[in-house]
């Protein structure tokens, strides 16, 4: 079976309370995130709870099932969010030790320090994302910039990144986000508009792929990843709290009398709207 905790099953902090933010702080994942000269930026609860926690546990469970097929033996999958978050940081830790990553946040090429890997504000107060790291993408970006390209010829001149970012910010502030969408349409520069939550499901790419499903009352992401043979489907809305308690207990062999007793004493909870 699998089990997941924040701090892990052992260690001096094993029994301490904590939340996603605390786990990624201790794992070294929080400190590098944010702008230069500012405090670390909180990345929602995606890094610890979901990335370092839930996904790592699911991955571990699948690995254990595959191993059991050959060994015939089971085992416990122990997932700690601090371990998972630290694992997600492996490449950054390696870059730091190799001298390719500065300790000061917001000064590296993947944390907003570089002019070619950044989020820029547009004329209408919205934002675009740019990720023109590789030479072919950067060259395409310079073509788009036209006469301004001469100011950005030295892509990896890190000392001049701040100045180049300022100049690029001024350029992108001259058009709206939709106008930049039109400019970059069909050009491989690694570009995408920054979509707000209320916008995301309406984007043509998502609509073409069916990334989101909408039943008229609520919308949510479709199941992912996708399988070629056993396609997942949403059969209905999310269950209400305790909606299937009795059904599940019956599947485990409990009688109606036993279930009623558990509900009466508060050992389990039934539907809260009953």
Which residues does each predicted region cover?
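Structural detector of well-ordered beta-strand residues that form the stable sheet scaffold
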Residues: 1-2, 192
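Active-site-adjacent "lid/gating" segments in soluble enzymes
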Residues: 2-128, 132-133
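Aromatic-enriched alpha-helical interface/lid elements that frame and gate functional surfaces
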Residues: 115-187, 191
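Conserved PLP cofactor-binding pocket of PLP-dependent enzymes
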Residues: 185-206
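Flexible, small-/acidic-enriched active-site or ligand-binding loops
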Residues: 217-261
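Amphipathic terminal alpha-helices
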Residues: 257-274
């Amino acid at each position: 079976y699998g089990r997941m905790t924040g701090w892990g099953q052992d260690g001096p902090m094993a029994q301490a309370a904590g939340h996603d933010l605390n786990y990624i702080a201790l794992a070294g994942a929080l400190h590098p995130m944010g702008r230069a000269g500012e405090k670390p930026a909180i990345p929602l609860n995606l890094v610890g709870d979901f990335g370092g926690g839930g996904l790592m546990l699911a991955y571990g469970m699948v690995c254990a099932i595959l191993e059991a097929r050959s060994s015939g033996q089971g085992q416990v999958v122990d997932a700690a969010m601090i371990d998972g978050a630290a694992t997600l940081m492996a490449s950054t830790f390696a870059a730091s030790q190799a001298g390719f990553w500065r300790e000061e946040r917001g000064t590296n090429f993947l944390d907003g320090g570089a002019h070619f890997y950044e989020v820029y504000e547009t004329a209408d107060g919205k934002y675009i994302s740019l990720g023109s790291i590789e030479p072919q993408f950067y060259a395409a970006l310079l073509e788009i910039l036209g006469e301004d390209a001469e100011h950005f010829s030295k892509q990896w001149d890190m000392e001049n990144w701040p100045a180049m970012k300022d100049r690029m910010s001024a350029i992108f502030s001259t058009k709206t986000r939709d106008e930049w969408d039109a400019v970059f349409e069909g050009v491989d520069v690694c570009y995408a508009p920054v979509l707000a939550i209320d916008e995301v499901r309406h984007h043509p790419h998502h609509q073409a792929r069916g990334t989101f499903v909408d039943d008229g009352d609520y919308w949510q992401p479709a199941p992912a990843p996708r399988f070629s043979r056993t396609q997942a489907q949403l059969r209905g809305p999310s269950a209400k709290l305790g909606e299937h308690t009795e059904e599940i207990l019956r599947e485990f062999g409990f009688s109606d009398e036993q279930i009623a007793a558990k509900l009466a004493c508060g050992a389990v909870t039934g539907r809260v709207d009953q």
